[in-house]
UniProtKB/Swiss-Prot annotation:
The keyword Metal-binding does not apply. GO terms for cellular component: cytosolic small ribosomal subunit. The gene is rpsF. One of its GO terms (molecular function) is small ribosomal subunit rRNA binding. Pfam families: Ribosomal_S6 (PF01250). GO terms for biological process: translation. Binds together with bS18 to 16S ribosomal RNA. SUPFAM superfamilies: Ribosomal protein S6. This is Small ribosomal subunit protein bS6. It comes from the Bacteria.
């Protein structure tokens, strides 16, 4: 059987329990066709880059799947029918990653910071020093007369 990673986006106006029920429903479809679910990661309610079916946010869920192609095709068909599923993406992989996905580790990194995610500047105001792409500075007219 082939290994897949599957990301599911569910509508924002349903609860997290309903999202979990959706995942269980699709798990049943997959197992009925000879597949197995691996780890399930709920990424929570996140903003979308653009509106999808009048939704600005969606519940993201990542699922590792070990199933034949026919089982995955049937699960995707069921997702197209379901109104609570906004989008989904299934990608075939060579092996599943161990531990947390990159999305969850990035979220944990943000929590470890002090809550301020602005880039830090060097002290000293507006002067950032010489850029190095200009030649030496010519003296101004009033500077040349003072020195002589």
């Amino acid at each position: 059987m082939a290994l897949y990673e599957h990301v599911l986006l569910a509508r924002q106006d349903i609860s997290q329990q309903q999202v979990d029920a959706l995942v269980e429903q699709f798990k049943g479809v997959l197992e009925a066709n000879g597949g197995k679910f691996g780890k399930v990661e709920n990424w929570g309610l996140r903003p979308l880059t653009y509106r999808i079916k009048k939704n600005r946010k969606a519940y993201y869920t990542l699922v590792n799947i070990d199933a034949p192609a026919a089982a995955v095709a049937e699960m995707e068909r069921q997702m197209r029918i379901n109104e609570d599923v906004l989008r989904f993406l299934t990608v075939r992989v060579e092996e599943h990653e161990e531990g947390q996905s990159a999305m969850l580790t990035r979220r944990d990194d943000r929590r470890e910071r002090d809550g301020d995610d602005r880039p830090r500047r060097r002290e000293g105001g507006f002067d950032r020093g010489d850029r190095g792409d200009r030649g030496p500075r010519r003296p101004r007219d009033n500077e040349a007369g003072e020195g002589a």
